[in-house]
Structure formats: C-alpha cells, structure tokens
Amino acid sequence: MDVRLLLENTLPGLGYELVDFEMTPGGGFRVFIDKPGGITVEDCVLVSNHFTRLFMVENVDYERLEVSSPGLDRPLKKEADFVRFSGQLAKIKTRMPIEQQKKFTGRLAGVEDGSVKLDVDGRIVEIPFANIDKARLEPEF
C-alpha cells in the first residue's frame, strides 16, 4: 500500500491539503496538513483519528502517527505552493549551482515556464523546478 497516495487521495475529501509526509525511524509516519485559514489542534485530531481507522482497514503497518501543521517555515513542494505564497520570503536550495551558488533567500516573484522566480535583493533569479532540492518559507517577524 502506497501511504503517500492514500493520504493524497483522502485528505482533499476531508478539506485538507497534504503538505508533506515523512516516514520516521521505527515505523512512524509524520503527516503535515494545511487548509485555508490554518490548522488547529482539532484539525490534527480529526485527521489523526480518520487515518488511524483507515490504516486499520487498509492494513497499513505503522508504530506511530503524527499529524501537524507545516509551521511558519512551511516546505514548498508543488508549483501551486510557489504561486500561493508569491510575495513571501523563501529559502531555496538547488541541486546544481546557479550563478556559482546553491542557496538563495528572496521573495517569491511568481512561476513561469517551469521555473520559480525569486527576487534576491532586487535581482530576479530563475530556478527550474527540476533543480530545486529544498524550498521553505522564511518566517518574518
């Protein structure tokens, strides 16, 4: 059973988006969810209870299930994430260097032709999706 696929197919019906999913050492699952307006503790409990029952029905073997919000430094995984958070500060690490560097911090400035546009100190850097290793929002206080 592909647990990621199970999560991706089930969460939208509950009104949530799958932000990320991790398998932890010892047979645990860590699930990060979101929805417009943010996530509450009650949301996490509801999703956890739902998946506990679903995993039992689907015979998914696991030791521990953690459900939480993605936090202020939310990972950016899908093209829609980069569009949704346009204008916000983000950190992006690339697989291969662009202009002799692999780590960038700047404002998300849109998505075009398979690349993320990042405003780094007034200069637009285009980063192809295929070259993104990790991307996260950078909290501003």
UniProtKB/Swiss-Prot annotation:
UniProt keyword tRNA processing, yes or no: no
Alphabetized InterPro entries for the sequence: Ribosome_maturation_RimP (IPR003728), RimP_C (IPR028998), RimP_C_sf (IPR036847), RimP_N (IPR028989), RimP_N_sf (IPR035956)
One GO BP: ribosomal small subunit assembly
Keywords: Cytoplasm, Ribosome biogenesis
Subcellular location: Cytoplasm
A GO cellular-component term linked to this record: cytosol
Pfam family, one: RimP_N
Top-level taxon in the UniProt lineage: Bacteria
CDD domains: YlxS_C
Function as written in the Swiss-Prot or TrEMBL entry: Required for maturation of 30S ribosomal subunits.
Entry similarity comment: Belongs to the RimP family.
Protein name stated in the entry: Ribosome maturation factor RimP
Organism expressing this protein natively: Chromobacterium violaceum (strain ATCC 12472 / DSM 30191 / JCM 1249 / CCUG 213 / NBRC 12614 / NCIMB 9131 / NCTC 9757 / MK)
